[in-house]
Amino acid sequence: YGYRMTAEDFINKGQLHVTHMPGNAKKADWMAFINDFVISFGRKLIDMVHSYGKKAYVFYDDSWVGVEPYNGRFQEFGFDGLIKCVFSGYEARLCAGVDVPTHELRLHPYLFPVGLGGAPTFMEGGDPALDAKKYWNSVRRALLRAKIDRIGLGGYLHLVEGFPDFCDYIEKVADEFRLIRSFHDAGEPYHIKTRVAVLHYWGSLRSWTLSGHFHETYMHDLIHINEALSGLPVDVKFISFEDVKNGILKDVDVVINAGR
């Protein structure tokens, strides 16, 4: 790249470089540099998994630095599937929009004694069935717009023994999911003619997301817009200012610019 990075390039006067802020050329160079390494090393690991007749999935959450499912190079890894844990509809769209054979959602609440912020979940005082209903209501509307192949839960299975109402509700969720998936197998969902573009610095690289889950980024307008759009019957694309310069707006009816 012809130059050295400095500490300030990362610290950015204390603002860091979270993706709900505009980036710069150095940030883009760093992301490309890391992406090159992760692809080259990750592909070796995936080939190793495949050599034993197994499939390789990537968990699109806790740490996906250098994976970049939306930068056009994700297919170079050779992953067989993508797993995304979801609280909200936009996260379901984030998973569904990646070009990979299998898309899977990990539903909340996780099978842990406590949940967000230390609140009781699968323990005295918890109501995991109510939590599951709240999250499923948000996720389900997005599933009607984009196909997901599988759903699942994570955690300690024995914890559900004392919560039969949770087990009954998850059975209902599974049945609803199978029905929704069958709709997608039958054909594309209905869309009205309106074509919406969300415009910000990152464009398609940060389709359907900012810097984390809804409860971590609720203070930013853009996450609310993403969530609203995730279940609406409109065509949605994420575009950058460079895309605008190249004439992409000729194929767009509504432009939303709600970045920082």
Predicted regions and their residues:
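Polysaccharide-binding and catalytic clefts of secreted carbohydrate-active enzymes
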Residues: 1-94, 186
